[in-house]
Amino acid sequence: MQISQAGINLIKSFEGLQLKAYKAVPTEKHYTIGYGHYGSDVSPRQVITAKQAEDMLRDDVQAFVDGVNKALKVSVTQNQFDALVSFAYNVGLGAFRSSSLLEYLNEGRTALAAAEFPRWNKSGGKVYQGLVNRRAQEQALFNSGTPKNVSRGTSSSKVTPKYKVKSGDNLTKIAKKHNTTVATLLKLNPSIKDPNMIRVGQTINVTGSGGKTHKVKSGDTLSKIAVDNKTTVSRLMSLNPEITNPNHIKVGQTIRLS
């Protein structure tokens, strides 16, 4: 599963936004910017936009999304997942993995798991109102209803594969590695305005590599391809973001099926 915009908004509401680089403590090695993004990639006089700050936050949160996914052994709703990611992002993955909250949840005792949120209201043994407020909102989100559970491992919703940029990478090289195009990567990553401006450590959306494909033949339509391969048009369009109109595919075009 991936965190929703509602989950991102919850985290943003508690992290606070700074568009100029700063040091909370003068002796800190690196600068901080955006929603608490800290590291060697932040320069002393750097200034960013609110959109760039959210993109940085999403990159930072991704490790916690992955960590929560790995720790869960049961089905959860999107709201529950968002609350868990916010919680893990705040307390740390180690604390989340060893928590009674996760233990109860994986045992199927959801009500007991929800009751654990308010206990995590201290830092250094002292209760902080900010943590009380955050836990209350996470608990409320966790307990709020959604239309249906999202089954782990069998969900029909697509989780976009991720790739972390390494030293020496460029968008052309990444596209080739994942059997796709730079244009497709740019559509999957609207925050990338310049294909020559990606940074080491950045997490970008990619298409799955090595999956099943179909080369469009004369007489093919997206509906026919979907039926022949026991899938749906919407699923094919999500796998092929370069297809913006299901009625416009061309002979010889390669379409990803999985």
Swiss-Prot record:
Keywords: Antimicrobial, Bacteriolytic enzyme, Cytolysis, Glycosidase, Host cell lysis by virus, Host cytoplasm, Hydrolase, Viral release from host cell
Keyword Hydrolase: yes
Keyword Membrane: no
Cellular localisation: Host cytoplasm
Reactions catalysed: Hydrolysis of (1->4)-beta-linkages between N-acetylmuramic acid and N-acetyl-D-glucosamine residues in a peptidoglycan and between N-acetyl-D-glucosamine residues in chitodextrins
Pfam family, one: Phage_lysozyme
Enzyme class at the top of the EC tree: hydrolase
Location, primary (coarse class): host cell
Free-text note on domains in this protein's UniProt record: LysM domains are thought to be involved in peptidoglycan binding.
Family assignment from sequence similarity: Belongs to the glycosyl hydrolase 24 family.
PANTHER family: LYSOZYME RRRD-RELATED (PTHR38107:SF3), PTHR38107
Protein name: Endolysin
Organism from which the protein derives: Bacillus phage PZA
